[in-house]
Regions:
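Generic short alpha-helical segment signal, independent of protein family or function
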Residues: 44, 55, 73-76
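A generic structural signal for short hydrophobic patches within well-formed alpha-helices
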Residues: 9, 36-39, 107-108
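Active-site neighborhoods of divalent-metal-dependent phosphate/nucleic-acid chemistry enzymes
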Residues: 12, 18, 60-119
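Short, well-structured N-terminal submotif of metal-dependent ribonuclease cores
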Residues: 1-31, 40-52, 117
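A general structural signal for well-ordered alpha-helical segments in protein cores
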Residues: 32, 36, 47-50, 65-69, ...
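Short, acidic/turn-prone active-site loops that include or flank metal/cofactor-
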Residues: 34-36, 56-58, 106
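Structured helix-beta-strand junction loops
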Residues: 26-27, 53-57, 96, 114
Length: 119
């Protein structure tokens, strides 16, 4: 399973993405309420149909505020150029034992070296 970030979904909606299509067909895509929320704010063709489909995808484990805070402190994520929603998604991907697929270069680099929020 892979947690697919908003940036990947935006590219998929604009231009398509065969890898994301394959992962969707194989049932290997996770989502998160924050990703769905960000997509809701976008201008999406066939909006209701798309949102209905993405809402039916399995959800990543949602990190608590304490878990995200611990992740930020443990990994010294402050001043690294990622946002709080990014930190939530990062914590959720770690807790779900699923990689985070993002086109955000900073978030991608951080996700590859982060330690779990607890433990």
């Amino acid at each position: 399973m892979v947690l697919v970030d908003t940036s990947v979904w935006v590219g998929f909606l604009r231009e398509g993405d065969s890898l994301l299509s394959d992962l969707l067909n194989e049932g290997e895509v996770l989502t998160h309420p924050f990703i769905i929320g960000e997509l809701r704010l976008g201008n999406i063709s066939k909006r209701q149909h798309f949102l209905s489909l993405i809402n039916d995808l399995p959800q990543a484990t949602q990190a608590t505020e304490d878990e995200v805070t611990h992740l930020i402190e443990k990994n010294k994520l402050y001043g690294k150029g990622i946002g709080y929603i990014d930190a939530h998604l990062l914590a959720s991907s770690i807790m779900s034992v699923s990689p985070l697929w993002t086109l955000d270069k900073r978030l991608d680099a951080i996700s590859k070296k982060c330690k779990p929020p607890i433990g």
